[in-house]
Amino acid sequence: MNPVIELLLQRRSVRAYEDRTLVQEAKDQILEATLRAPTAGNLMLYSIVEISDQRSKDDLARLCDNQPFIACAPWVVLFAADYQRWHDLFAWSGVEETCRQAGEAMRNPEVGDLLLACADALIAAQTAVIAAESLGIGSCYIGDIMENCERTRDLLGLTPYVFPICLLCFGYPDARQAGKERSSRFERKFICFENKYRRLIRRAGRDDRGTPTRVIQGPQVDRWCRQPGAARL
């Protein structure tokens, strides 16, 4: 099997790490690879913030649904959708004045711009994950970074047109990870379609959705059910 494909198939989330610092050379290799990630129009609508301050890591662990392993991870990195850089560049380049002379207002970033920037940031994040995996460094995505984005903005100094889309924890997997099974996935027939989207639940009833990858339970259930679209599943 192609070694890249094998690496992708074997990848899993790692939440327990060796007490071992990531050397700067490894970080540099990961970041250099990340900056070559595909990006819309070569705009690179994202920013990367390395969290080295322990107090900030402790705060993020609490803000992200009280997950203590975040505070213990050797390398914690925020990937943010960033339209602020281009907005500032437009203003600095005199676009606002040009618009004023034309009798028009300078357009501020809108929802479509945010979605495009989020896509850029997530593509970059996944590139970092695979680059790290190739060096034997595990990782775990933290989506909860979005849940308290106002407090995260204050903590990390994010400006109005910067949105924290995901946090990544990196580190060398400890011995407890060696025998850990990979989580299951839906079968391909439930995910991959040809030419047109298929709403499976309408075609063959609820059973056609397959077996869930995990059962949602515990104190997070109520909050999850309040998420947009959850009631329609």
Where are these regions (language model features)?
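Acidic, surface-exposed loops and disordered segments
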Residues: M1-L233
